[in-house]
Amino acid sequence: MAVSALNMTPYFGGYPFQGQGRVNQLGGVFINGRPLPNHIRRQIVEMAAAGVRPCVISRQLRVSHGCVSKILNRFQETGSIRPGVIGGSKPRVATPDIESRIEELKQSQPGIFSWEIRAKLIEAGVCDKQNAPSVSSISRLLRGSSGSGTSHSIDGILGGGAGSVGSEDESEDDAEPSVQLKRKQRRSRTTFSNDQIDALERIFARTQYPDVYTREELAQSTGLTEARVQVWFSNRRARLRKQLNTQQVPSFAPTSTSFGATPTTSAAPAPNMGMSLYSSQSWPSSGAYENHAAYGGSVASMSPASSTSGTSSAAHSPVQTQAQQPGTGSEFMTSTYGVGSSNATYPSAAYSMPQTPATSAEQLRSQFASAAASGSHHPSTWDSYNFAGSFFPPASAAGNHISGYHHQVDQKSSMMTTAPTYPYFGF
C-alpha cells in the first residue's frame, strides 16, 4: 500500500528546553523567572574569594556577567547569597557571626527587644548601619530560633523523618559561604609627567592606533604599564574627535567687511553746475549698477570705496592734491597714487553742492541731459582718474556712451600734480 507524502504527519519532538527554559549567549541554561541555584551562587562567591575575576567566572560557569556582578555585590553588602527582589528585599542577616551574636544576646537577656539588639550590634562594631540587619529580620530570626525545636505545622507532624531529611538538604544548600570578599579599591588617577606626555604625543602624531609592540616599547620608555598607554591613546582619540567636531561647527558671526565707506569731502564751488551728482559708494566688480544715494549735496565723485579690512600695512591709496584751474577761480582735485594711511579706504574728491535731493529717476536723467547739452562738466569727475587714451573708443564710434561728457586730460593740470599718475580703473 502506497502512502502519499501529503498524508504523512510530520514528527516533531519539541524543543530541547520547553516552557521557561532558555539558553544564554554563553551556552548556559537558565529558567526565566527563577533565581540562580544556590550551589552556583556559592561557587561564584568562592571563586571570587579565590581571586578569580568576574569575567572569568562568567565564562567558566556560563552565567551572564550581570548576574555574577549582582550576586557578588549583594554578598559584599549583606553577606548573603540568598535571592531576593531587587530594591524591595529586606536586608538579610549578614553572616553566621552576626546570627551567633544575636543568639548570645537573646540568651543573656531574654526580654531584650529587636531594636536593642540592632543597636548593640552597631555599638560593638560587629556591623555598621549600612549592612546591619533590620529590626524585622532580627525578630524573624528570633522567632525561627525559638520555634525550631518543635514544629506544630501539618507537614511537620505528618512528614516524619522524610521532612527532616529534606530540611537537612535544604539547610545545606542555604548555608551561607564563610568567606570574606575584599572590597574593591578605586584606582587613583594616573598623573603623567611632561616627558611622558611628550613621548605619547610623538607616537600619537605618527599613528593614532599603535600596535601592541609600539605600546610595549612606549610603556618601557615612559615607565607606564601597557594598559595605561592603551587607555591614554583611547582618551586622546576621543579628545581629538571632540576638537574636530567643535571646529566643524560653522560660525554665524557677521563678517567685518563693510561696503559703505565714509566719503571724505572738501568744500570747493563747482562752476556752472547747479545739479548734485550722485555718489557711487563702491565700484561694482560684476558690472551691476548699485543704488545711488545723495549725501545732502556733498557727494563722492565716482570713487571706488574698498572694504575696511584689518590690514594695517601701508597701502596704495589715491592721494588728492588741490590744483588751481587756469583761467577760472575754481579748484579741482587730482587723484594720484601715494602711500596712504593704515586703513585701506579710498577717499576721493567731493564737492559741496546745493542741497537738491534726488527725488526720482526722471530728475536725474533730466539733470544729466542738461549737463551733457551744455557741456558744463567738471574735469575732476572723470579726468581725475587719468584713463588711457585707448581705454575709451573714439568719439565718433558707435556705442560710445562716455563721449558726451568725456574730455581729454589737460596737460597743464596733469603737470601740476605732485607725483606721477597711474591709471586706476577701480576694479
Swiss-Prot record:
Ranges annotated as biased composition (Acidic residues): 167-176
Expressed in which tissues: Expressed in the posterior ventrolateral part of each segment throughout the embryo, including head and tail segments. At first expression is restricted to the ectoderm. During germ-band extension, expression is induced in the mesoderm.
DNA-binding region: 19-145, 185-244
PROSITE patterns: HOMEOBOX_1, HOMEOBOX_2, PAIRED_1, PAIRED_2
Region RED subdomain, annotated ranges: 97-145
UniProt feature, compositional bias: Low complexity: 142-156, 253-267, 300-317
InterPro entries to which the protein is assigned, alphabetical: HD (IPR001356), Homeobox_CS (IPR017970), Homeodomain-like_sf (IPR009057), HTH_motif (IPR000047), PAIRED_DNA-bd_dom (IPR043182), Paired_dom (IPR001523), PAX_fam (IPR043565), WH-like_DNA-bd_sf (IPR036388)
Assigned keywords, A-Z: Developmental protein, DNA-binding, Homeobox, Nucleus, Paired box, Segmentation polarity protein, Transcription, Transcription regulation
Region (PAI subdomain): 22-78
Polar residues: compositionally biased ranges: 318-336
Region listing for Disordered, in residue ranges: 142-192, 248-267, 300-336
Compartments, as annotated in UniProt: Nucleus
Biological processes, Gene Ontology terms: chemical synaptic transmission; nervous system development; neurogenesis; regulation of synaptic activity; regulation of transcription by RNA polymerase II; salivary gland morphogenesis; segment polarity determination; ventral cord development
MF GO annotations: DNA-binding transcription factor activity, RNA polymerase II-specific; RNA polymerase II cis-regulatory region sequence-specific DNA binding; RNA polymerase II transcription regulatory region sequence-specific DNA binding
Entry's Gene Ontology cellular component terms: cytoplasm; nucleus; synapse
Family under the similarity heading: Belongs to the paired homeobox family.
Reported function: Expressed in segmentally repeating pattern to define the polarity of embryonic segments.
Listed name of the protein: Protein gooseberry
